[in-house]
Regions:
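N-terminal secretory signal peptides that target proteins for export/translocation
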Residues: 1-17
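Structural microenvironment flanking redox-active thiols in thiol-disulfide oxidoreductases
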Residues: 93-133, 142-149
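Short pre-active-site segment immediately N-terminal to redox-active cysteine/selenocysteine motifs
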Residues: 78-80, 84-88, 155
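Thiol/disulfide oxidoreductase modules built on the thioredoxin-like
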Residues: 128-136, 141-186
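N-proximal helix/coil linker or "cap" segments that precede and/or mark the start of modular domains
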Residues: 31-59, 191-197
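A short beta-strand-turn-helix
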Residues: 49-54, 59-80, 103-106, 150
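Bacterial N-terminal signal peptides
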Residues: 23-32
Length: 197
């Protein structure tokens, strides 16, 4: 063996080991991100919700926390953020303060949040949380039929932005930041009159 050959081999092996280490660290990082990322949106299957943009949003008749029947068609002419959620879902609860603010900001421009709670215990668990957080938008108690009509809701939160004509503009799986929701809502609303947000 020529002098210096072992040194060259060691250098090659060392460089290969470094490349391997970088690849391994990157793979571990990607795997970790994939494992923790769904928790933000509480995704169960990663399946997109039903309801392609342009399709009519399925109507429903559900009971609100006061026992009154509420229909999606009651809101025709408004931009509706239809939010499927549950009290046991941490990302859902985290979004509620943002929805309260969005309702305050944009309800005067023909926008509303409409929450559909998918809790098995219904109003008994939803009402105390709504009161505690000061929810200012309509909440109704969902059921398996309405979930099925919207594609079998595979994860919460799942939301649908519905246009003034009652057609789906966009579907979302997982939680979003207030700024993301605000951008989406502003794009859907008509231009603001002077002095409006």
């Amino acid at each position: 063996m020529r002098p210096g050959t072992n040194t060259a081999v060691r250098r090659v092996n060392s460089a290969s080991a470094r490349k391997c280490a970088v690849v391994c660290v990157a793979a571990i990082g990607i795997a970790w991100w994939a494992a923790v990322s769904p928790a933000r949106g509480a995704e169960i299957t990663g399946k997109d919700p039903a309801g392609a943009p342009g399709e009519a949003a399925p109507d429903f008749a559900l009971t609100n926390l006061a026992g009154t029947t509420v229909r999606l068609s009651d809101f025709k002419g408004k931009i509706v953020l239809l939010d499927f959620w549950a009290t046991w879902c941490a990302p859902c609860r985290e979004e509620i303060p943002d929805f309260i603010q969005l309702q305050k900001q944009y309800s005067g421009r023909g926008f509303t949040v409409l929450g559909i709670a998918l809790d098995e215990d219904g109003a008994a668990v939803v009402k105390p949380l709504a009161q505690k957080l000061g929810v200012n938008y309509p909440l109704v108690i969902g059921d398996t039929q309405v979930a099925a009509r919207y594609g079998g809701i595979q994860a919460v939160p799942t939301a649908f932005l519905i246009g003034r004509d009652g057609r789906i503009l966009k579907a979302f799986v997982g939680a979003r930041s207030k700024s993301e929701w605000e951008q989406t809502i502003r794009r859907a609303l008509p231009p603001a009159a002077p002095g409006q947000n």
